[in-house]
Amino acid sequence: MKINRVGNYKTGFKYYKNKVEITNNDEIEKIKLLKIPPAYDNVTIINSKKVIAYGYDSKNRKQVLYNPNFIAKQNIIKYKKISNSIKFFSKLKKKIANDLSNTDEKIKAIAVIITLIFTCGFRIGNKKYEKENNSVGLTTLKYKHLKFENNKILIDFIGKKGVRNLAYCDNKKINEYLNNKHKIASSNDDYIFSYGANKIITSNDVNEYLKMICNNTIITTKDLRTWNANMLFISYFKKLRISDNTNIEKDIKKAIEMVAKKLHNSYSICKKSYIDPDIIANIAKYK
């Protein structure tokens, strides 16, 4: 049964079921326990196994509040898929290393994008996000987001949720690629990752590239960030243990902080949505 929330956080809320106001205090308290953001407008409460409610933010963008149990199950599936795909990622790294020298413009551009996901922690991005949120990702990166400094390139843009993404790229092949593209660009507002007659690389193009390498499991650009987060976490943790082998909890926390910074995320989002809890649990056992 759908319930509609009317009002705002300043004047208070009323709840309606079939256009009849809910006045039972117990029912109202149950709704409040769902913790639906007060800033959302036109809220519809579903409270199903998948979705608790949806509403619209200040920019009239639809926002969905998912059931925590659904998210937990999806995370289990996500981490299992990642842990079962070690051969895929090994194969992918070899392919993109080769494709950075590919003469096909499209394939080479995709290889550069995937390399930057791994080395700089950037999101893939898309034109819809750019238009609606004024946020940039790799497929919507423009020359104005690059700063050439000696043998390195600084990539600087505003990404998802208004977070500034800032990272240096010191990969020689990628720097050569970006330098050459920049020299022939007609404007700093041009998209970098284009091919042919100004065709722009999209997230779908990158996912199709990944699909060619996959066997049965479909790996997407989102999975690349998850895999990268866990590999970075393990690497950072090992380095921290060399200098401090007394406090595992402290090193786990610090390693997650380092991953969050690399991925341009908050600590809580990184821990909740990117790092496999089984990896953390297994590490924590060896005190």
How does the language model describe each region?
Residues 1-136, 144-227, 231-252, 256-263, ...:
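A positively charged, amphipathic N-terminal helix/segment that binds anionic biomolecules
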Residues 273-287:
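Catalytic-site neighborhood detector that most strongly recognizes the C-terminal catalytic loop/helix
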Residues 266-267, 277:
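The DNA-contacting recognition helix of HTH DNA-binding domains
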